[in-house]
Amino acid sequence: MRTYSGRGHLNLGGEESPDENARLASGVPGLDALMGGGFSKGRIVLVLGEPGTGKTIFCSQFLHGGAVGRGEKGIFIGMNEPKVKFLGEMKALGMDLTALENDGKFSYVDASDVKHIPEQAKVGRIPVGGRELGLVNLLDTIQEAVDKTKPDRIAIDSISDLIFRYPALEDRRPVILDIVETLQATGATCLMTSELLSTSQDRTLQPEEYLAEGVVILKMLRKGTRTIQVLKLRGSKMDTKPRPYLIGDNGIEVLSSEEVYE
């Protein structure tokens, strides 16, 4: 098991600089028009949103689209709900991830135990901080899944339960940085979701927004009205205006040419 330095520096080796000209389709209809054709290959993108905005669906479409459209392998690292429930909900939206799993194009990794580790735990007889052990377990889980699958796309849903165990914002930064560096070392294009803490126009940026290479914000303006905004996407031309989106029978669809009226 690796050790956690608390400084945000893990050297896994094998990193390659992303090709900023290479694009991966997001799998979300209408979204690529806001991002110059898709996500930059090999980048780490944060998807921030309130509950009910479709973060899990967003990640699933990203992985499903890569597998069906391009034959790419994807890993979903779930920290919130059981695999059976997740697969059933996504199948109801037209994404048969079980079939893709049988074809070797999709893997579900259950990392929910990370958030259940007590504040004080033990490795053998040695007492360790539960928060730190949770992080180490997550990073090991990611690396083991990558070594086994060699994925092109990875999604983690969500990192909130882990990082919110650190009340002080300055303590969260090295945790997030370790997650980001671990994902960067895989060479895959990665999404990680987190809870949006404030929807106000003058909100304070969350630590994970500074460390990710791309940021997509999902908001609920009022009942039935949702907006998506590409806030940051390194190496890409962006439409940064909030745009409306729908969650229908086939998942998320971005209305990229429509304005948002509050």
Where is each model-derived feature located?
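Loop/turn-to-beta-strand initiation segments
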Residues: 73, 105, 150-153, 185-193
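Conserved nucleotide-binding/hydrolysis micro-motifs of P-loop NTPases
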Residues: 80-84, 92, 112-116, 160-161, ...
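Short hydrophobic/aromatic beta-strand immediately N-terminal to the Walker A/P-loop
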Residues: 45-48
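Conserved P-loop
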Residues: 50-125
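C-terminal regions of RecA-like/P-loop NTPase motor modules
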Residues: 2-18, 239-262
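Pre-Walker A adenine-sensing motif
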Residues: 26-38
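Phosphate-binding/switch loop-helix module in NTP-utilizing enzymes
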Residues: 115-178, 182-184
